Amino acid sequence: MDYQTLIDAPTWAFIRASAAEYPDDTVSLTVADQRRIYDTMCRAFHRGYPPGITASDGAIAGVRCRVFDGARPAVLYLHGGGFVVGGLDSHDDICAEISARTGLAVICADYRLVPEHPHPAAYDDALAVARALLADGPLLLAGDSAGGNLAAAVSRGLRGASGLRGQVLIYPGLGGDPDSGSGLTHAHAPMLTREDVLFYTDLRHAGPPPADDPTSAPLQDHDFSGLPPTLAIGAECDPLCDDAAAYAARITAAGGRAMAVVEPGLVHGYLRARATVPRAAASFDRIIATLTAFAAGDWPSGDPQ
């Protein structure tokens, strides 16, 4: 794959900056070292909070959460990190910006991580928080990477809930076939490789993943009805890219409303580049516009229906 052509100069600068903080071989280190290095990288890319935005920490359904005050419906944001790394500090500037730009309350859940807590611990935590929030009013779901997986699984767990206004999945891993499509075409993509995906999948389950568990791999479900309006975003240069389109297509085929967008030339983890890479900034604008529309019960204008 000719990434020199597909990926533009600002994105390459982001890739190099990421590699300086989180080298490609980090996945081969101990989990403790992976977390230490990841936390350092997150601090390096942290953009702070927009003016007037504050957050408070507490527990929801027994799960530690960070809450950014705002209007309802609230957004439950589930962070990425391969189910291994990340937490309340890793994505809170992203959550702060979402809150500032949409005016909505945003809640980030500090779900349990592997390998200490294999699947379904993270799913159980995310579903418990979502149910508690939904009991208080309408809700939106959003998440990137592993968090996109959790958001889709939680949507299934809440299937048909009238207060679930929509979900936005950002470069999610949804259990698509790693031996076909983007899994092969972008097996050696910058930022995330096919081997990385397989490593994190096995670690999540303390061994090979189950063959038919939609709480772990939402694309393994046999029923895609009753799911909320959905935006699923794939990064073109990412082995997970095809999962977004496959998921949106199945919702649409089941009579739901969903759209998939492939962001050209972007790589896994590009949300951290939203201030430095124009393509990433445009994608973040799309995310904000979609959350705003879903919150109002609308479909995003200018997007395919």
Range-by-range predicted roles:
Residues M1-V67, P210, A296-Q305:
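A glycine/proline-hinged amphipathic helix-loop "lid/cap" segment
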